[in-house]
Amino acid sequence: GLERVVNALRVIAPELPFEIHFREIQGAQQVFEMDGYRLIAYRVNHNVLCYGYSIEIDRAGKFDAVRAKEQEIPLKYWSRLQKGEQIEENGTCYTPDMVLGAPRKGIKLTYCTDTRPTQSLVENAMHADLLICEGMYGEPGKEEKAVEHKHMTFTEAAEVARKAQVSEMWLTHYSPSLNRPEEYMKTVTDIFPNAYPGKDGKTTELMFEGEAKEAS
């Protein structure tokens, strides 16, 4: 598996400035929880085994100072409760749900290349803030080639974005013969307006609702 491949490569680079933790995917879908992030790996439809990925960051409810005061929760515990900690003091237990409102909308990024349109992709991309999706073929008349090689056309990617109700989509993973993907974006935006051609070095910031966003 992956661990064997990476360890073989480390023969030529034995010293790394970071640790590697191997978590290999088992089955059609698997969820990994790590450091406040949720990574969902799901199988897609290509000529070889491939997975798409969604990264989710949850956002807790807003801290309610009025409720905290009404329940006489010591001020020194407010920040810890806001971070999700449970606190016990002299037989009294303070829990985050005592001072937090309903969970707020978090952040979701979905990334997928090397696949035909699949229901698993639509379901796992649902309501993503950003979908980075393969668009191998932009030119008309490439539908049969897309089916043969198990890739997507621009319009098929646009349909995925529309069905998944994502906020924004970037196309990527173009055919080497596609020199100017922007020339074919009209066929995409007719289906899903908030779509853009991805390019090397393109960046953005995904922010929680109510926070400013910058893109380049």
Regions from the PLM with identified roles:
Residues 15-17, 34, 104, 164, ...:
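Short, well-ordered coil/turn elements that cap or connect secondary structure elements
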Residues 19-21, 38, 194-196:
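Conserved beta-strand segments of alpha/beta enzyme cores
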Residues 1, 45, 137-138:
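Short "lid" loop at the C-terminus of a central beta-strand within the Rossmann-like core
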